[in-house]
Amino acid sequence: MSLNSFGHIFRFTTWGESHGPALGAVVDGCPPGLALTEAQIQPFLDARRPGQSRFTTQRQEPDQVRILSGVFEGRTTGTPISLMIENVDQRSKDYGDVAKAYRPGHADYAYDAKYGFRDYRGGGRSSARETAARVAAGAVARLVIPEVSILAWVSEIGGDRIDMDHFDAAEIARNPFFCPDSWAAARWEKLVDDARKSGSSLGAVVECVATGVPAGWGAPLYAKLDAELAHAMMGINAVKGVEIGDGFAAARNTGEGNADPMRPGAGVPEFLANHAGGIAGGISTGQPVTVRVAFKPTSSILTPMPTITREGEATELLTKGRHDPCVGIRGVPVVEAMMALVLADQKLLHRGQCGG
């Protein structure tokens, strides 16, 4: 079984490879009657699109989305929505050496070990190029949850964190790092530039907050909202860790310090803290849902690395091609999309079980 789908009721399947003719997504379970056009999806793809600054890969992809099915006269029909994005700037010749040897840190060896055959061009299915399809699907998911606002940003690159005292949401769209701290963004220019010029790469942390999520979404035990979010975020290329709320910091706290006290509010409780990240017992509390996602440094670097060939012989490999010096930067729209996809699914699940 090949697991290329995600979700329960609001479900999507992605298809395509980095150097194939196109990639895309099929969204199933979307309610009928929602206004949907390609123009509504495009801004989210534009935010993720490569080649927009020297701090991302220089692969030039317009990422123009086409809706092939599931929409009639500008409204969803309730049938599968097929979305397609053409690949137009592949340079497969850059990957000739990768056909014979495994790139350290990439999925090359693991794919060969599992399937006995792999598309080595740009990583094939394991390439972060696949995330364009998720972003398109996430734009559709947002239509299902108009009451929810989702915002993500880069909070750390190469160990250099933002100062939350300088947080300005409006700043996120003003710089190429999706950074809410203009002081940090200025530092990151040199940090990422130095990595790019030396042929190295840097890791990053992306934070995401969803506000407007009502209490009651999610389920206990094996279908927890936080488990669904962790599943979604860990499925993003290059992600190596996920925290909900305070995450690992909770292990260094006390019961008193980690609790989220409440007092009476206007019809709903007023929380005095949000260490839990808006989720308790796997169910949303009505507080903002908060997630942090750790992206590893891009494995494609210009330093020759020891590896082996498909025949098991020792060799060295220098990765060619066009790559992100910090893949976490373009991870921001992807994290937002996965948050939207999970929450749209959870809303429909809750409605089906509880009628809310």
From Swiss-Prot:
One Gene Ontology biological process: chorismate biosynthetic process
GO cellular component: cytosol
GO terms of molecular function: chorismate synthase activity; FMN binding
Keyword annotations: Amino-acid biosynthesis, Aromatic amino acid biosynthesis, FAD, Flavoprotein, FMN, Lyase, NADP
Highest taxon of the lineage: Bacteria
Subunit note: Homotetramer.
Biological role: This reaction introduces a second double bond into the aromatic ring system.
Name recorded for this polypeptide: Chorismate synthase
Provenance organism: Novosphingobium aromaticivorans (strain ATCC 700278 / DSM 12444 / CCUG 56034 / CIP 105152 / NBRC 16084 / F199)
